[in-house]
């Protein structure tokens, strides 16, 4: 599922896809479908480390920034950390992604890496490897950052889909599955009637950051 925020500050479920062959070719077809349906521009795409997504974005929407999902980045880091250290480790990770600018974030990254790597050798490798797609977040204010990396809406949808899966574990075809997903999405998105919090401030900042790409 791809969730977007329109220029009016409201959330929209843009597309639902069923596929098991994630690649740059696959994601390019998904993004091109959005273009064909009228999506003219995307400022930022926030996603997990999906195979080929960065290349597909560059081809379909060359001006769009790809931001690695911070929530998934943190989850992947803590995946193999035992409970006794997880809370302290998570608190230290916050010093990276909640830093006021990239320079301070890099200092925090070095500190956290030095502290935890001796105990969990591979835990911080993905942060350094993925820094080019983690770091775009630091040019935004805290208000805009929350819009970009808050996953409440998408997690709510995913929870709806998991509930659907528990109710019926087998679907006779992809078409049957898509129909069920569309109905569940339609019901879930009925509640999306309000604008994003602090949208006027967010819109103003984005208008300056991405000059000429948003309506006056």
Report the location of each language-model feature.
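Conserved beta-strand -> loop -> alpha-helix junction used to position metal-binding or nucleic-acid-contacting
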Residues: 44-51, 56-92
């Amino acid at each position: 599922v791809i969730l977007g925020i329109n220029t009016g500050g409201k959330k929209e479920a843009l597309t639902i896809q069923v596929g098991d062959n994630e690649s740059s070719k696959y994601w390019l077809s998904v993004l091109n479908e959005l273009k064909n349906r009228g999506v003219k521009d995307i400022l930022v795409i926030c996603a997990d480390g999906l195979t080929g997504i960065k290349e597909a974005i560059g081809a379909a929407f060359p001006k769009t920034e790809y931001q690695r999902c911070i929530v998934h980045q943190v989850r992947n880091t803590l995946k193999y950390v035992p409970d006794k250290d997880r809370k302290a480790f998570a608190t230290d990770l916050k010093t990276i992604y909640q830093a006021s600018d990239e320079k301070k974030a890099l200092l925090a990254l070095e500190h956290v890496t030095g502290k935890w790597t001796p105990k969990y050798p591979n835990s911080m490798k993905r942060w350094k490897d993925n820094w080019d797609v983690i770091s775009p977040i630091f040019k935004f204010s805290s208000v805009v950052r929350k819009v970009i990396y808050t996953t409440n809406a998408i997690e709510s949808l995913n929870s709806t889909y998991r509930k659907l899966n528990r109710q019926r574990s087998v679907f006779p075809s992809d078409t049957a599955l898509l129909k069920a997903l569309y109905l569940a999405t339609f019901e879930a998105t009925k509640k999306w009637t309000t604008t994003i919090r602090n949208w006027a401030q967010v819109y103003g900042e984005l208008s300056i950051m991405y000059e000429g790409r948003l309506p006056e």
